[in-house]
Each structure stands twice: as structure tokens, then as C-alpha cells.
Amino acid sequence: MKKLIKWLIEEDNPSVKFYTLTEILNEKTDKGAEDLLRKDIESCAPVSSIMALQENGGWWHEDKYSFSPLYKNTFWQVYFLSLLGATKQIFAVDKAVKLIIANMQSEKGAFPVHDRYTGNLICFQGMTLEMLLRLGYFEENFTSSLSAFISDIVYRNDFRCKYRAQFKCPWGAVKVLKALNLIPPEKRDHKVSDTISRAVKFLLSHDIVEANYPRKKMKSRQWYLFSFPRGFQSDILETTSALIDAGCKSQNSNLRNALKYINEKRLDDGKWKMEYSLNGKMLVDIEKNNKPSKWISYFALKSFIKSKFRSI
């Protein structure tokens, strides 16, 4: 494990270094130290590369605001930046978020999907909330209204999706769970806690590795390919990581089998590789496909340690 951690905290990927220090090693950093780490993230690729493509008006790709085209426009760049560790303290990021809020959020707090798919799809609502929370918008009304909308729609529909013939959608449940995990327990109201419980119950009620969630179509091969960053789809690693962040432990047999599956994909040198990539679809590539991945290795190692799956 020491060799793997040493690799993860190398200077060439300040984002993974930051998350490894804070989420795996649990190092307590004061504000000054955290600010320095965040500055490193901001000044290095791929964050700096994404920021360099931003137009003066605050947008990317085109001055239109929606979830389409996938992975190219303003929403997606800000979403990727949030995953990489950027925050609202970056003026240009805050400027872009204000454009997204002004042009995409409905009066109900939701972020409707248009174009090829339509409606308040739960996967995109979860991703948007995760983005806002990661960037540091915890207290803003636009965040709380989205969180409330998600809790209400989950209470009514329980993760059902019209594009899954009204069956419950595990991808949507994972995206929502990832977002709500970011809210400190002491700041969760009963609706947030109930939504987390519903997501956990649904995801664990079906075999994660077999992916035997209700469906009409064949299961997606994406479920078995570890990837970062993910779009609206999900995989076994992201699902397992979200459940563990929600407090689930390896004593659960379903989760333990998923952890075993993740462990079986470990390379001989103790790392994990990127098995699917959005490179070529995004404006800026992140790592390399079919090569050892610091991001995939970070999520796998964090899942093992937090779940107490095994001594590494």
C-alpha cells in the first residue's frame, strides 16, 4: 500500500494528491495548506487546460446552456472541474456557474434536460448537485432548492426513469448518492437522510456485480468498465465507492462481492487501469485509456480502506 500511496501523491497529479492526502491518509490541513494544494490544482493540467479554453464571456464551446452537446459545453467543463478539485474561489469558475444557474435552473429548482432526452432526469439532477457542492456552494438558495427538488422527486418516483420503461435507474441513484454524501451529516435534514437511505437500499437490493437491476433492455457493458470522469452512466467502482462513502461496510455480502470484483482487476504492480475513457469526446483529455490510472487507483484504494475490506 505504501508504494501505491507514494505514487498517488506524486506532484504530477495535484488533484489525486489532494484527495489521497485528505480522503485516504486523513491528513488535517489548515486553510493555508489547503489553499496551496488548491492553487497547485488550479495551475496544473488538466484544470489549467480546461480554464484556458474558456471564452471571455464565461462559457465554453458555445454561448448556449444545456446538457448537450455531451462533454463539450459549459456545464460539462464546470462539472469536470469540480471533480478535479476546483472550487468557486476561482473567479472564472464562479462566473460560469452563475451563467449555468441563470440559464438552466427552473423555478422548481431542477435542471431540465432538453434536446435528445427531455425532462428532469434524476441522473443529471444528481450530477448537477454534486458539481455545486464540490465547488463549495453549500449555502446558496440554488443549491438548496435543487436538493429539495431531488428529495421530493425521489420520494414520489423512487429513482424511476421514463427512459428505463419506468423501472428504477441505478445510474441515477448513484449520482444522487454521490452528491448527498457531500453534505455533512449535521447539515442533513430528514428529506436528505431519507433520500440517502432510499438510494442505498435500492442499490444494495440487487446484485451489484451481476447488475440485475430491473430493466427491459440488455445491461450496459459500461457497468464493468472503470472510468474517470464518468458522464451520466455509472460502473461498479463508482457505485461501490458511493455506497462506502454513505457508510456501508464490507460486512454486507453484496458490497463485499463488489469489492472482490474490484480487487480482481488490480494489476500486478498494485495499480488499476482506466478501462473506458471520454478522451476525444471532452475538450481536454484526462489520463490515458488502457493505462494505469491514478484516479481509478485512488477510488479503489479509498473504497478498500474506508470499508475495511482487507489489509492492503
Predicted regions and their residues:
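Preference for long, amphipathic alpha-helical scaffolds in soluble/luminal domains
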Residues: M1-I312
